[in-house]
Amino acid sequence: VLPGNECEKNMHKAVEEVNLSDANLVIINGDLTNEGSDNELANVKSILDKINKPLFVLPGNHETTWSQSATKTIFDLWGNDRFVTELDNLVIVGIACGPYMKMGDGHIKQEDLHWLDKTLAKHCTAGKRVISFNHYPLMKDLDNYDDYIRVLRKYPVIAHVNGHYHKYHKYVSENFGNINCMMVRSLDMKKGNYGYTIMDIDADSVKFHNKQLGKEPVYVDGFAVSYPSIDGDVESLANQQPLYTD
């Protein structure tokens, strides 16, 4: 989104639609801006402030790679670059992914892995299920994706949701982990296709719907709720302590 461009105009429309919907909460999963400048971020913040539902914002590579403030502006505007919240029996959690060097790979900082592990250990009481959010997929786009998966694998994660590629694509976490994952659309999918994703989660399934502005939602894909099977890559989950301790 740039001040005055078509994305800005359609972000306003998306906010209006969301405010009239029955959505429980809103998650912005990175790439809010083109170049991550302070001016662009402040402009997006002024639009998102009109959302009348709980809002959680994660930065993407466009916010970190070209940040004018070493990502400090994200904290100044939204208070943090990670979040956790609960909705009924769901624990919804998201962390940042960099890159923290220009043109580098995505990277999960050790302090964020530490926070994720401790946070899920605290929130995952009996009967809880986890939805994980990150701008990057659980693939080699993240240079330490295996460490990330090892933390997630300890908890009842039923889905990981990412952006970055600006398309819909269902996949399973790369190489190990067996975590069900879904890439989702961006606001602008070109050729006048502006919109967002609606997630429906019930006891048995996670479903993703493409919501083009001004049109009815269309089912895209989904999966039955299941939990990653234990394999040789990760030690038994039973009585496992946090990987990252103070």
Short names for language-model regions:
Residues 24-26, 130, 158:
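Conserved acidic residues
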Residues 30-31, 60-61, 135, 163-164:
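Active-site glycine-centered loops adjacent to acidic/histidine catalytic or metal-binding residues
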Residues 3-6, 32-39, 64-68, 138-142, ...:
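Acidic-and-aromatic substrate-binding clefts and catalytic sites of carbohydrate-active enzymes
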Residues 200-246:
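A short C-terminal boundary segment appended to hydrolase-like catalytic domains
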Residues 132-139, 158-168:
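Histidine-centered catalytic micro-motifs
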Residues 118-140:
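Short acidic, glycine-rich surface-loop motifs adjacent to enzyme active sites
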Residues 1-42:
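N-terminal active-site segment of His-dependent metallophosphoesterases
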Residues 38-126, 147-159, 170-184, 190-202, ...:
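Extended active-site neighborhood of metal-dependent phosphoesterases/phosphodiesterases
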